[in-house]
């Protein structure tokens, strides 16, 4: 009896100790705490507010981990309560899912806990997906659960190319379609919601043909497997891209935070650790690089760009920086790259053949005055080297049957969208094309049109500024903010930023005293921003755009969000402003001419 009581006591002690620490390694916990305090000094503690939230020690450590490494936008645009809710859902999977205790702390921390997958707007998908998927995968082994989640994803989203802006998981479901970057973001979010480590894998450019692709890796029972997002197969490690992937030069993913896993690190920043996954897909080789100046001395912190030939250009697939000894290295598929090294206006380059070259020295002996006019290069991609996993006829037939059924579910949902035929008698016929393009967001666009029927010209002008994707996910409160604002500059979008909060009426009031002078001379607005908005000192920070309201609130941002902020404020005050779609310069119009904005 005493032995039983002692055993129970020790079990309780161990469990409570585990529960109190999200990060069990004290050294890493101290590193995270140091990074958290540094972040608070940059953004201000008002954006980390746990008052009234009843945060446990374990939850607080998880919050500190997220805040330590999240982009500034995620700290200033989403309240602490939002992040805490998602943490609680993630921690719940440790006890509610059968694999919860099998997932290593390292993988849970970096590939389950984080909400952000790529550059999508964050949403409330985690709790929603957990409620639906936890029941659906009940009783399944981990690998089968991954396959089942992908079937669920296929019921809701299929492939369609679109613009560069990435929709959130819930926005993708509403639309029923997404490009590969959106499908993989959605599938990673679904897997993480039930405690399965998952990451978006990306080949920035194929080596053997134009284009790129993104898919998913998920961890089960000690191993990472790949799958085509929203493209279910009977088994893992099988997708349409098995053969192209075997010919790739680079595969990478961004692990949230300071990740200390076994993979080769390509870049480590204060937000993420970019890791090289090429070894999972084909035959690879490593080359050591040494960067020297014209005198042959090692160059510290030289930027080294590894370039793949694609779309008739040498595209930078990854950038690394040399150490104090002037060296760096890369593992890649056995093909050719151009390696371009530079620092302080000096540069040099060389062709690297992975699988043949072992080490290469690049001298920074060129500049703008003496750069070569041409170079004769033969670029050879890796050879195909594919071994497909076995699939029985019964497995293939069952998978095909399921795909057909899943298509019918998705098609039934899409059939609820308005069509030209169903809208042929609509009284506000000029708005019909916008309502049809809105797909799953059609009720919002239709309600907006009808609410402002007495201001139809302005309402239609506003809708005409929106892209097809904007029509599919623009909320009513953003439309109304732009509709009710006094400004004639109706467009709410500058580039591919997230539009999360209303801002035009806010800035009308915030700059009421300065508005007249800013309209007369927009350079004064440029000067105001230069004097009042600090730049994030971290030059390698992940540039997720902040909303203009959070730039105003935090008074700290990066150059991208600062430029968006300028255009949004200018338009709010009736000043015509834009991002030049060709040169990507911020401009305002004065005396009928576009004037470039220079913040430097």
Label every PLM stretch briefly.
Residues 268-280, 353-391:
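Extracellular beta-sheet/turn segments enriched in Thr/Pro/Gly and aliphatic residues
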Residues 326-338, 342-346, 353-356:
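Short Pro-Gly-centered beta-turn/loop motif in secreted/extracellular proteins
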Residues 294-313, 334-336:
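Short, ordered, surface-exposed loop/turn motifs in non-cytosolic proteins
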Residues 24-175, 211, 397, 406-554:
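Secondary-structure boundary elements
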Residues 310-331:
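Short, acidic Ser/Thr/Gly-rich low-complexity loop/linker segments typical of extracellular
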Residues 22, 131, 135-136, 140-141, ...:
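Hydrophobic/aromatic-rich core segments of domains that either
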């Amino acid at each position: 009896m005493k032995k039983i009581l002692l055993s129970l006591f020790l079990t309780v002690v161990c469990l409570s100790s585990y529960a109190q620490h999200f990060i069990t390694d004290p050294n890493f916990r101290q590193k995270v705490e140091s990074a958290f305090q540094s972040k608070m000094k940059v953004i201000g503690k008002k954006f980390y507010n746990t008052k009234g939230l009843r945060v446990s020690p374990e939850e607080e450590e998880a919050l500190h981990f997220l805040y330590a490494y999240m982009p500034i936008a995620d700290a200033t645009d989403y309240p602490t309560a939002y992040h805490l809710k998602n943490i609680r859902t993630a921690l719940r999977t440790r006890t509610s899912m059968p694999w919860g205790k099998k997932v290593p702390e390292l993988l849970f921390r970096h590939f389950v806990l984080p909400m952000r997958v790529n550059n999508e707007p964050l949403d409330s998908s985690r709790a929603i997906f957990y409620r639906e998927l936890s029941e659906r995968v009940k009783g399944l082994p981990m690998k089968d659960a991954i396959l089942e989640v992908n079937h669920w994803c296929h019921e809701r989203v299929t492939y369609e190319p679109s613009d560069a802006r990435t929709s959130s998981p819930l926005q993708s479901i509403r639309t029923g379609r997404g490009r590969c970057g959106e499908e993989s973001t959605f599938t990673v979010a679904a897997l993480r919601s039930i405690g399965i480590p998952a990451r978006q894998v990306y080949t920035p450019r194929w080596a053997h043909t134009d284009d790129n692709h993104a898919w998913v890796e998920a961890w089960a029972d000690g191993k990472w497997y790949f799958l085509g997002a929203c493209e279910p197969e009977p088994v893992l490690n099988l997708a349409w891209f098995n053969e192209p992937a075997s010919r790739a030069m680079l595969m990478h993913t961004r692990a949230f935070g300071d990740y200390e896993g076994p993979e080769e690190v390509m870049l480590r920043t204060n937000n993420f650790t970019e890791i090289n996954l090429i070894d999972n897909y084909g035959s690879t080789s490593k080359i050591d690089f040494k960067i020297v100046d014209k005198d042959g001395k090692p160059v510290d912190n030289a930027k080294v760009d590894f370039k793949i030939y694609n779309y008739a250009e040498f595209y930078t697939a990854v950038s690394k920086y040399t150490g104090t000894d002037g060296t760096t290295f890369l593992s890649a598929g056995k093909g050719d790259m151009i390696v371009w090294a530079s620092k302080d206006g000096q540069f040099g380059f060389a062709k690297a053949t992975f699988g043949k070259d072992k080490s290469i020295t690049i001298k920074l002996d060129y500049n703008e005055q003496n750069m070569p006019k041409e170079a004769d290069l033969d670029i050879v991609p890796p050879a195909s080297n594919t071994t497909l996993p076995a699939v029985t006829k019964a497995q293939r037939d069952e998978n095909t049957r399921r795909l057909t059924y899943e298509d019918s579910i998705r098609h039934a949902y899409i059939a609820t969208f308005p069509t030209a035929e169903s809208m042929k008698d609509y009284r506000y016929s000029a708005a019909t094309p916008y309502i049809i393009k809105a797909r799953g967001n059609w009720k919002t666009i239709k309600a907006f049109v009808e609410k402002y029927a007495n201001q139809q010209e302005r309402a239609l002008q506003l809708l005409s500024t929106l892209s097809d994707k904007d029509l599919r996910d623009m909320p009513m409160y953003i439309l109304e903010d732009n509709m009710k604002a006094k400004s004639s500059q109706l467009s709410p979008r500058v580039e591919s930023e997230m539009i999360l909060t209303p801002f035009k009426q806010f800035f009308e009031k915030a700059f009421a005293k300065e508005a007249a002078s800013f309209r007369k001379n927009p350079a004064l607005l440029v000067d105001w921003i230069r004097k009042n908005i600090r730049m994030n000192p971290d030059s390698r920070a992940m540039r997720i755009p902040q909303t203009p309201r959070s730039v105003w609130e935090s008074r700290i941002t990066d150059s991208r969000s600062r430029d968006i902020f300028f255009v949004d404020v200018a338009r709010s005050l009736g000043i015509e402003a834009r991002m030049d779609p060709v040169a990507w310069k911020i401009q305002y119009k004065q005396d009928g001419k576009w004037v470039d904005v220079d913040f430097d």
